[in-house]
């Protein structure tokens, strides 16, 4: 991937006083199951600092974090991780037996999130936000990434979030317009290239595990074997997921040295894996996110200063 210092801007912000487009800033939250509470902490800090991005990209749990961020709902994401996830209705063997899905995404992004629900998404505020939204899911039939936009969200219809968070094997695929989808991490776990291709000059990347942590693909390969007979293309995506993730993070580190990317990542997972329900670990990850976001605040401030000097 070759990225120029000033790529073509698609839909960047227009500065009328300068009669030119200003830099376009993107943010990516890669999710990571319940570790996504770290990203929730980062984005809550961004709201506190009134830090705004032009293109917001979410993968898996990161997509849910992004919608609350764009709606300006500070603190909304946190209870989904440290409170609701402990409920049987959210995730349980009971769900797996009754509904053939360990995670009841209809409960999470329907019952809880719809108007009148316990913790509704402010759809009107989300729709008013001038920022672009991208939600990444994986087409279960061909294994390709599907990049949903804000236009694919509707009041009380948050299926694209369900699609992006749908973990293969333990969940039935989420079907939208006849197409089955799985977690976006199968197709594009770190959509950095997509962000730059769509006009971003600089990108903030939120990871939910340490940058140097080497993940094994043994679990993915085992799950891919179970998925192979029904969704072979998705199974192949699962086999390649760790490689794709590592490759993209390595590229992000190169771009970080050039000042084009800011990586925000925890120094520890606090023992948290994708579906680990540990209240102490969740609280620590959220606190880490808010604290680590200080580096993002400084990076954005410096970038804005450089931009003003350049104009």
Per-region residue spans from a language model:
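Patatin-like phospholipase
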Residues: 5-59, 67-311
């Amino acid at each position: 991937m070759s990225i120029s210092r000033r790529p073509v801007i698609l839909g960047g912000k227009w500065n009328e006083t300068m009669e030119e487009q200003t830099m376009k800033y993107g943010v990516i939250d890669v999710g990571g199951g319940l570790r996504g509470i770290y990203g929730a902490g980062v984005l809550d800090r961004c709201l506190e600092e009134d830090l705004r991005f032009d293109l917001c990209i979410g993968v898996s749990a990161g997509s849910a974090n992004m919608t609350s961020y764009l709606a300006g709902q500070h603190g909304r994401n946190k209870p989904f991780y440290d409170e609701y996830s402990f409920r049987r209705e959210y995730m349980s063997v009971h769900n797996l037996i009754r509904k053939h899905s360990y995670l009841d995404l209809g409960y999470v992004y329907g019952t809880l999130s719809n108007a009148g629900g316990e913790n509704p998404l402010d759809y009107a505020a989300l729709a008013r936000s001038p920022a672009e939204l991208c939600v990444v899911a994986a087409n279960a039939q061909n294994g390709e990434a599907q990049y949903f936009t804000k236009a694919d969200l509707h009041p009380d219809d948050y299926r694209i979030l369900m699609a992006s968070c749908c973990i293969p094997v333990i969940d039935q695929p989420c079907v939208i317009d006849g197409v089955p989808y799985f977690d976006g991490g199968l197709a594009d776990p770190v959509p950095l290239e997509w962000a730059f291709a769509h006009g971003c000059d600089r990108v903030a990347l939120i990871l939910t595990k340490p940058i140097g942590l080497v993940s094994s693909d043994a679990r993915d390969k085992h799950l891919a074997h179970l998925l192979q007979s029904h969704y072979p293309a998705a199974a192949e995506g699962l086999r390649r997921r760790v490689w794709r993730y590592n490759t993209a993070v390595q590229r992000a580190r190169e771009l970080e040295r050039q000042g084009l990317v800011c990586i925000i990542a925890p120094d520890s997972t606090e023992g948290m894996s994708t579906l680990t329900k540990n209240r102490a670990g969740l609280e620590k990850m959220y606190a880490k996110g808010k604290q680590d976001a200080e580096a993002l605040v400084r990076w954005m401030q410096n970038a804005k200063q450089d931009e003003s000097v350049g104009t």
